[in-house]
Amino acid sequence: MDSPTNDGTCDAHPVTDEPFIDVRETHTAVVVLAGDRAFKAKKPVVTDFCDFRTAEQRERACIREFELNSRLAAQSYLGIAHLSDPSGGHAEPVVVMRRYRDKQRLASMVTAGLPVEGALDAIAEVLARFHQRAQRNRCIDTQGEVGAVARRWHENLAELRHHADKVVSGDVIRRIEHMVDEFVSGREVLFAGRIKEGCIVDGHADLLADDIFLVDGEPALLDCLEFEDELRYLDRIDDAAFLAMDLEFLGRKDLGDYFLAGYAVRSGDTAPASLRDFYIAYRAVVRAKVECVRFSQGKPEAAADAVRHLIIATQHLQHATVRLALVGGNPGTGKSTLARGVAELVGAQVISTDDVRRRLRDCGVITGEPGVLDSGLYSRANVVAVYQEALRKARLLLGSGHSVILDGTWGDPQMRACARRLAADTHSAIVEFRCSATVDVMADRIVARAGGNSDATAEIAAALAARQADWDTGHRIDTAGPRERSVGQAYHIWRSAI
């Protein structure tokens, strides 16, 4: 074998506690570990994402792998060498790398139960710095557009469908596709904003715990995606979400959450929680597809891994679902308490009609005296103006990936119909809560209020209770009991809305 194409001046640590010669295999490559070096050769295979049938194609792929990985791990990638053929055939290219001990591998450390929070902090720092200097341009930005994001999902799901009801469930694939389409269809504002903020980068795109090593306290991030440039052009939170997903797959969702939170702090990324979940799910689907390929290559154990990855994808898409909740009821029924309690659990944005009314009055959009039903501040025209403004604000938040809880009486069926149209327009799941309490309880709560923006009186509450219209689509929440009970009931209903 000839020498690497660079000078190879980086000395490797001796590997004395593992076999001198070992072999590892992926679905597209074979890695021979020999002494203090690792030699990676491409398999002569064709998949939906690569074509390595000829030596020339494999040569180009090896060179590209070396160049791209030198961005993040220059001390680990030593160059390109060639295996010569004694019969005179074409020399086989191999990527020459520094060999690391298995105990230095992040995946090994995690599965051994070792403390890795410090390592994850270092990885988050390295990745954030890498993304800060990563290439950005108009061509890269196009891969963050709604159409490109949807296309990637559908291409992966189409590949998974080849294995439906053989390796993975066809029903699960269809459910995933539905949730993906709903998220993407209503989030044009979110994806456009990510492009405008410079979040689309030429990244790593294959950040797995198995390919990260801790060397002298510093992380080496190996094996980025090299076979198709466009797939490496991605949202930076998507790049980080890959490792978060993989840590969850290793049984440590807590570490995945820890890493992603640390990355967000170090990079200054402001992606909503829904987008983080969306991309964790995407990476789980990508890995499920890879496991299906491995299964088709004679690795029966890969089937269980594919199923587990789709479970992760489904769970995160459920969390990513953008929801619009109406929390209604008469004054004093505890609807604001319920709205705040649910929002604390799910991270939703609360819009209170009381707050909107106060702001509109302060800026002169609506006028009138408070305290009288159907007139003054509570005239029909003013009530409609308040609810329309609340819905306008909700539309902006929903389109940006934020779930919204609208806190108001919601006694008017026409206003509830407007809210349902908004949910349909933004492809958001809608859930409606109707808070209830006795007239005496409502009156006591109104009297006991300290400050706030509500102008409702006990008399208004009693009058509204007397004219309460049917609300068949509202889940009745009895708020007379402990707060924890009513909030817990609403939380479970919220989660079931897809």
UniProtKB/Swiss-Prot annotation:
MF terms in GO:
ATP binding; host cell surface binding
**Which keywords has UniProt assigned to this entry?**
ATP-binding, Cell wall, Nucleotide-binding, Secreted
Classification via Pfam families: AAA_33
What turns on this gene?
Expressed in growing cells (at protein level). A member of the dormancy regulon. Induced in response to reduced oxygen tension (hypoxia), low levels of nitric oxide (NO) and carbon monoxide (CO). It is hoped that this regulon will give insight into the latent, or dormant phase of infection.
Which superkingdom is the protein from?
Bacteria
Q: Where does it primarily localize?
A: secreted
Q: Where is the protein situated, by its record's location annotation? A: Secreted, Cell wall
Beyond the main fields, what else does the record say? Has been detected by antibody binding and Western blot in the cell wall fraction but no signal sequence is predicted by bioinformatic programs.
- What functional role does this protein have? Some isolated peptides of this protein are able to bind to human U937 monocytoblastic and A549 epithelial cell lines.
Protein known as: Uncharacterized protein Rv2004c
* Species of the source: Mycobacterium tuberculosis (strain ATCC 25618 / H37Rv)
